[in-house]
Amino acid sequence: MHEGTWRLPPCPRPEVVSLASALGLSETTAGVLVRRGYGDPETARTFLAAETPAHDPFLLGDMDAACERIRAAIAAGGRICVHGDYDVDGICATALAVSVLQDLGADVGWHLPSRFEEGYGVSADTLARLAEEGCHLLLTVDCGITAVDEIAAARASGLDVVVTDHHRPGATLPDCPVVATRPSSYPFPELCGTGVVFKLAQALGVPNLERHLDVVALATVADVVPLVDENRGLVASGLKRLARTTKPGLRALMASARVDPAVVDAGAIAFRLAPRINAAGRLGHPKAALDLLLTEDPQEAGRLAAQLESLNRDRQSVEERILREALDQVEQWPEAKRRRRGYVVAGEEWHRGVIGIVASRLVERFHRPVVLIAGGEDGWTGSGRSIPAFDLHGALAACSDHLERWGGHRAAAGLSIDKENLEAFAEAFGAHADGVLAEDDLMPSTHIDAVVRGADLTLSLCEELEALAPFGLGNPGVTLLAVGCELSALGAVGDGKHLKLAVTHEGARSGAIAFGQGAQLDRYRRALQYDVAFKLQANQWNGTVSPQLVVKRIFDTPDRYAELRKWLADQWRADPGERTAEAAAIFAELELVEEEAGRRHLVESPTFLDILRESFPLAA
């Protein structure tokens, strides 16, 4: 297989048939639901309805006490200051908190930290300044749960504090009301920071709160929290609200990003809207993004959206430059260093605001954990991204003797380091990765939701699969696989970056686009068969709508595939008592009976895949 392989979880056919009958779905869609844990008809109906569960907001941490403090501050006419963060979730949480507090008649101010001057979280200097400026109550959003000492000092100076957050707490909580997903008896701990503020607004009884679901959806998708349970309902409802939003800032942002409000989805948020909001905090100060979300003036909204558009273009340019320089470094490494299973790449004057994005792109390129470090006169800071098999947080812990500060989680982390320790850290990190990662861990594996035939790829199937949206973490877009395809009508598009092609499977031909695979044009022109992994979508062109394959990966179909199909056909025709053990196992795994032969694909059998991929000898 080229570029890794694919994996297909097992799926009991009787459950698929039963669910398809109960819900009136194709077996393809029913199979996707069963593989994702929605095999029970009622559970599947609830999932497809994407309604927001009515979880009680007062189960969320110290909600009663928080509401009491906020209401008291409003009644006393005291100023409430909302302290947020510089990413999309922190900006949206600040905008939502400011808006709902104003709806309740509060005197509200806000503070967003600079990534470069204050860094993440709550600083003692900031809290002291806010107290001096007359802040009566500090409300943190998307931050604060680990700021134990800072909040203690603020309270000692007379500043009242309420913390709302969704990050993991330390061993000790701040000595104030804490509204957070952990620790809590709340039944769904995966809300983003803006989602927590939304629950606070519910508890406060803010009227007409649904009008702010557009901002909640924006933050929930951007913060890459699981789109299941309450998050799924919030995003589904929020996307409908976003399509008809009256907020001038969001309308201007969609216009600037060329997003049609009528068809806005989670993908548009993740890849078009969120990067523009993030650009403000990545390259400068997040104030412009917050102003955009809060403004009631369409002209100001247009000006601010244009400013974010310019910042996002600058971000893209800086990102591409750093990526090129990082790739050049790796290419110049000696062969032994390139074979390391974990990379550390460092550069002078790289922009700290984008190194996390570049680290993610390097992980995609090299399929191994990467730490990217930017240095300058004010020190060296790094951002790391990982692969599923590697615990990045654990790796930094193992190498912590070389670091000044570090933190994060399994998939992503940050650090600061002294320049003199760079080489030692790179060596220690690479050695740790070599010790815990196997060669197979570095091979990308594409998760398949269902195996299909060319005749299955219809607009009706597009509509069924779209009902599983919104897609994101915990509910990824559906990936289908067609095995043994022929590729034709190949041509490079988009300055040679992408491929347009036709995919034919068992005589049924479909149009396809393969983004970022323009360099593979000559390879795919070979007269071979391929296994194509793709997402199915409805494509509108010149007034017509047709199904289109958005290709994720194309794998060489193993040479033995045709031989194995013929062998199994012979085994099927043989008397059951004369079949080999391998053939009998394959037929059992496919749950085949005489009248249903051919209803399932051979690659749904683990035994068949083992024989196909490992070149086991075939018994006669």
Label the predicted regions.
Residues 1-25, 39-49, 53-57, 61, ...:
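Terminal, basic amphipathic appendages of nucleotide-handling enzymes
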Residues 2, 9-136, 157, 205-206, ...:
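Hydrophobic helix-and-loop "lid/oligomerization" segment in the mid-to-C-terminal part
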Residues 8, 163, 178-181, 217, ...:
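Structural signal for conserved beta-strand scaffold positions within catalytic alpha/beta enzyme cores
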Residues 97, 232-275, 279-329, 342, ...:
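Acidic, two-metal ion nucleic-acid-processing modules in DNA metabolism proteins
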Residues 109, 162, 522:
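Conserved beta-strand positions in the Rossmann-like core of class I SAM-dependent methyltransferases
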Residues 120-121, 143, 515:
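Short gly/ser/thr-rich secondary-structure transition/capping motifs
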Residues 130-133, 137-225, 231-234, 396:
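Conserved phosphate-handling catalytic cores of large alpha/beta enzymes
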Residues 166-167, 351, 409, 498:
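Histidine-centered active-site/metal-ligand motif
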